[in-house]
Design a protein with these regions (language model features):
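Phosphate-end processing signature that detects enzymes handling 5′-triphosphorylated RNA
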Residues: 1-197
Length: 197
């Protein structure tokens, strides 16, 4: 288990080119090819994971299944994102299409949250860069819809994440970016957007 540090930024579309030039000037390079990412988030009927995240409680977790729709070789990752007093870490396991279908139908049982069913679908485009030991991801064209609901909401802003192990100093890199740090969860943001009006 490796704890990690995450910092998130909101960037307006009109500032994206400036941001990319900035990170390129300090030595950031492409880590992977850009790709489309799809995640289905699970929660219990009371949305306790959502509520814990909104309130910033520790420990808390999010459960999702992630895949990359445009990949020729389709695969699915069952992921647990866990936040604790000690730090954050992620546990994931590759699962088959059959197992994914079973989880969507039957749900996932969690010791703390009980039976969790699919709640929210999120799809977006992600770019991957790296600077020293800090991984930088840029998420654009973020779309949300409640599971089994055709109503789609889009996010106009761009989300940037800086991620590194807890032993690395991320603050020095973060200070080079004149953008606002935020607490942000795609799961919570999607639920909020889709519940407006």
């Amino acid at each position: 288990m490796t704890f990690r540090v995450e910092k998130k930024l909101f960037i307006k579309k009109e500032n994206l080119l400036d941001f990319k030039e900035k990170i390129s000037s300090i030595g950031a390079t492409n880590l992977y090819k850009p790709r489309k990412v799809q995640s289905i988030y699970f929660d219990n009927m009371n949305k306790d994971m959502y509520n814990d995240s909104i309130e910033g409680l520790n420990p808390r977790k999010k459960i999702r299944v992630r895949n990359y729709p445009d990949n020729i070789n389709k695969y699915f990752l069952l992921e647990y994102k866990i936040s604790s007093i000690e730090g954050r870490f992620k546990v994931n396991k590759e699962i088959s299409q059959k197992r994914f279908d079973e989880l969507k139908f039957n749900g996932i049982f969690d010791k703390k949250y009980g039976l969790c069913k699919p709640i929210l679908n999120v799809i977006y485009d992600r770019e991957y860069l790296i600077n020293s030991n800090v991984r930088i991801t840029i998420d654009t064209n973020i779309l949300y819809n409640m599971y089994n609901n055709k109503i789609i909401k889009s996010d106009k802003d761009i989300v940037v994440e800086l991620k590194t192990s807890i032993n690395q100093n991320i603050d020095e890199l973060f200070e080079k970016f004149p953008f606002q740090e935020i607490r942000f969860s795609k799961y919570c943001n999607g639920v909020d957007l889709l519940n407006k009006d």
